């Protein structure tokens, strides 16, 4: 599933082909995604794109006619291709530009979304989102305070979008390993020093993943079709029964919150 670094990589990849250019039209081949594609998007003709930003795992396209909000879902990806590029299976959505290019959304599982709003501050899917992990707002004081009343597993706590956005399953595993913290540790037992270490490591891991173009495990590709290379640096995720890169103990896997969790029982004692 594309996580924050993959969406940031997508944002950087598509921006040069969209920002400042004109949308000639939007083609919707299958409106039935996770939420039905907003009908307003079919009315877009000769609309200028002003900017592109990201909120959590949502891609936001700022236009003269409001905001186009995209989410890649479980297996979605976007590519920049020429107008005459053949349409493939699962190509559900195109933003056709006036520069000979188009943004094409492909999603086999149809669990993504393309929505519209004229007011970002009132967009319902953003109401309960926590701070961006790479922002100054997300600091150790905030994380420590937020953890005080939480009896959930630390990994579940970090993946809660109301606490902080964008720390998905892959990166949560890597972050906890680097911090030497067991994924089942109860969040409210976190010390101030551990909160400081977590915040530092979250920022470090996500920044490095963005620099590497995200993580390609199955479905994600960068907008130019290249894979993300952070997968080559994964220390514990997907490495069950392989030796820990630090101590040689076999990596274990357990289910936490219906997600596979990988850890070293020696380096990450409960």
Swiss-Prot record:
<dbReference type="InterPro" id="IPR020629">
    <property type="entry name" value="Formamido-pyr_DNA_Glyclase"/>
</dbReference>
<dbReference type="Pfam" id="PF06827">
    <property type="entry name" value="zf-FPG_IleRS"/>
</dbReference>
<keyword id="KW-0862">Zinc</keyword>
<keyword id="KW-0326">Glycosidase</keyword>
<dbReference type="InterPro" id="IPR010663">
    <property type="entry name" value="Znf_FPG/IleRS"/>
</dbReference>
<dbReference type="Pfam" id="PF06831">
    <property type="entry name" value="H2TH"/>
</dbReference>
<dbReference type="InterPro" id="IPR015887">
    <property type="entry name" value="DNA_glyclase_Znf_dom_DNA_BS"/>
</dbReference>
<dbReference type="GO" id="GO:0034039">
    <property type="term" value="F:8-oxo-7,8-dihydroguanine DNA N-glycosylase activity"/>
</dbReference>
<keyword id="KW-0234">DNA repair</keyword>
<dbReference type="GO" id="GO:0006284">
    <property type="term" value="P:base-excision repair"/>
</dbReference>
<dbReference type="GO" id="GO:0008270">
    <property type="term" value="F:zinc ion binding"/>
</dbReference>
<dbReference type="InterPro" id="IPR000214">
    <property type="entry name" value="Znf_DNA_glyclase/AP_lyase"/>
</dbReference>
<dbReference type="GO" id="GO:0003684">
    <property type="term" value="F:damaged DNA binding"/>
</dbReference>
<dbReference type="GO" id="GO:0140078">
    <property type="term" value="F:class I DNA-(apurinic or apyrimidinic site) endonuclease activity"/>
</dbReference>
<keyword id="KW-0238">DNA-binding</keyword>
<keyword id="KW-0863">Zinc-finger</keyword>
<dbReference type="InterPro" id="IPR015886">
    <property type="entry name" value="DNA_glyclase/AP_lyase_DNA-bd"/>
</dbReference>
<feature type="binding site">
    <location>
        <position position="90"/>
    </location>
    <ligand>
        <name>DNA</name>
    </ligand>
</feature>
<dbReference type="Pfam" id="PF01149">
    <property type="entry name" value="Fapy_DNA_glyco"/>
</dbReference>
<feature type="active site" description="Proton donor; for delta-elimination activity">
    <location>
        <position position="259"/>
    </location>
</feature>
<protein>
    <recommendedName>
        <fullName>Formamidopyrimidine-DNA glycosylase</fullName>
        <ecNumber>3.2.2.23</ecNumber>
        <ecNumber>4.2.99.18</ecNumber>
    </recommendedName>
</protein>
<feature type="active site" description="Proton donor; for beta-elimination activity">
    <location>
        <position position="57"/>
    </location>
</feature>
<comment type="subunit">
    <text>Monomer.</text>
</comment>
<feature type="binding site">
    <location>
        <position position="109"/>
    </location>
    <ligand>
        <name>DNA</name>
    </ligand>
</feature>
<keyword id="KW-0511">Multifunctional enzyme</keyword>
<feature type="zinc finger region" description="FPG-type">
    <location>
        <begin position="235"/>
        <end position="269"/>
    </location>
</feature>
<feature type="binding site">
    <location>
        <position position="150"/>
    </location>
    <ligand>
        <name>DNA</name>
    </ligand>
</feature>
<keyword id="KW-0479">Metal-binding</keyword>
<comment type="function">
    <text>Involved in base excision repair of DNA damaged by oxidation or by mutagenic agents. Acts as a DNA glycosylase that recognizes and removes damaged bases. Has a preference for oxidized purines, such as 7,8-dihydro-8-oxoguanine (8-oxoG). Has AP (apurinic/apyrimidinic) lyase activity and introduces nicks in the DNA strand. Cleaves the DNA backbone by beta-delta elimination to generate a single-strand break at the site of the removed base with both 3'- and 5'-phosphates.</text>
</comment>
<dbReference type="InterPro" id="IPR012319">
    <property type="entry name" value="FPG_cat"/>
</dbReference>
<dbReference type="InterPro" id="IPR010979">
    <property type="entry name" value="Ribosomal_uS13-like_H2TH"/>
</dbReference>
<keyword id="KW-0227">DNA damage</keyword>
<feature type="active site" description="Schiff-base intermediate with DNA">
    <location>
        <position position="2"/>
    </location>
</feature>
<keyword id="KW-0378">Hydrolase</keyword>
<keyword id="KW-0456">Lyase</keyword>
<comment type="similarity">
    <text>Belongs to the FPG family.</text>
</comment>
<feature type="active site" description="Proton donor">
    <location>
        <position position="3"/>
    </location>
</feature>
<dbReference type="InterPro" id="IPR035937">
    <property type="entry name" value="MutM-like_N-ter"/>
</dbReference>
